Amino acid sequence: MSEATQYDATHARWKRDPEAYWAEAARGIDWDRAPQRIFDAAMGVYGRWFPDAALNTCHNAVDRHVAAGRGQQDAIIYDSPMTGQVQRITYAELQHRVAKLAGALAARGITKGDRVVIYMPMVPEAAIAMLATARLGAVHSVVFGGFAAAELASRIADAKPKAIISASCGLEPGRVVHYKPLLDEAIALSPHKPSSVLILQRPQAPCELTPGRDEDLLVAEAAAAPHACVSVAATDPLYILYTSGTTGQPKGILRDNGGHAVALHHSMELVYGVKPGDVYWAASDVGWVVGHSYIVYAPLLGGCTTVLFEGKPVGTPDPGTFWRVCADHGVKILFTAPTAIRAIKKEDPEGVFLKKYDLSKLEALYLAGERCDPDTILWSERLLQKPVVDHWWQTETGWTITGNFRGLGLFPTRAGSGGKPAPGYDVVVLDE
């Protein structure tokens, strides 16, 4: 079977019997109650996936890997040029920390369905907070760290969180962004007030805590009893992610637990061709959909090691940073935005910095977030001598709409093309 035929046959198989296709994909997830029905077209506006099933997303992303004997594998590699720190967190360590933070949230009254706003920089505690919220069956809403107070206030007002998890500061090249004054102002502006605020005190700029409301995150986590995973319906919400709309009220994307877990787990092998134990790096931010899907959930659902990077493509300290991270940690797939590659290309057009590093373990570069100009793809292919895949999707979908699929064998494509539709999508051009 030729490589192109494997894509064609797989897409045709999905189109012929979508429910059978997704029933098979659903076998990659641990269910508390396995789905008997795959899709109910009559539920909701667009139909609902796995309407009779139950699971916990945190269990699937963390606990099951420990139970399967992968506890000593790295789950998260935190690499921060901003602090000069590299921290490796195994699946067993991640399970311990997530269970403890879930216990701290539960002790503060957070239960299934409650909302938790997370306003954090790119630190492991951001991912731990997301997973701890999911562990309780609660709903997280991550707001990009450093967003202005008015933007944060509108999201607090809309989501009505019982708790907020934040940090004292974020770090940008040449400056410290103090989060606490922004958070205090946002809470003052919002008609809804959280009952609990947990703050990660970063040594670069600790902040004063508001008595009676604020607590030290790490102190609260350390003092808590670990909490087990709470089973939720597949159709129950996992998170709200507000789109960066410029008009009117913020628009919240509400993601369910079941369909999300199945699609993201499936995408790791289908789209990116990675398997458990592989190192995967989405150079994005947890505040955006790429961060939700491909820094936190998909790599962990797939039993991979995910890189959580606090830095920039250039200036932290140089345009070789991305290649240094790939070499140091044995990254197999790098996923970033064309803007990042263009910034590197501008500062290092001949790849002088790139040539300093051993990129033998890197197998492909994936790009998304905006259309990629052909020059950037051709430049990347020439210097890396690896496949470069431009793929397209949206906050609303959470994973690939069109792309090229390493798990099926890459088909030939032209620079500037967004590829072909993923199984699950029937893409039609309606107008020239």
Model feature map: region roles:
Residues 1-89, 93-96, 100-103, 182, ...:
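N-lobe entry segment of adenylate-forming
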Residues 120-134, 146-150, 284-302, 395, ...:
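Conserved coil-to-alpha-helix start sites within the AMP-binding
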Residues 58-59, 76-131, 148-153, 216-218, ...:
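Conserved AMP-binding/adenylate-forming core of the ANL superfamily
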Residues 116, 133, 237, 243-246, ...:
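Conserved S/T- and glycine-rich ATP-binding loop of Class I adenylate-forming
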Residues 116, 137, 246, 303, ...:
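Conserved G/P- and acidic residue-centered "switch" motifs that form tight phosphate/ATP-binding loops
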Residues 138-142, 157-168, 238-241, 252-347, ...:
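AMP-binding/adenylate-forming
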Residues 72-74, 197-200, 210-242, 249, ...:
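Conserved pre-ATP/AMP-binding loop-to-beta segment of ANL
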Residues 149, 153-212, 276-277, 311-432:
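Conserved adenylate-forming
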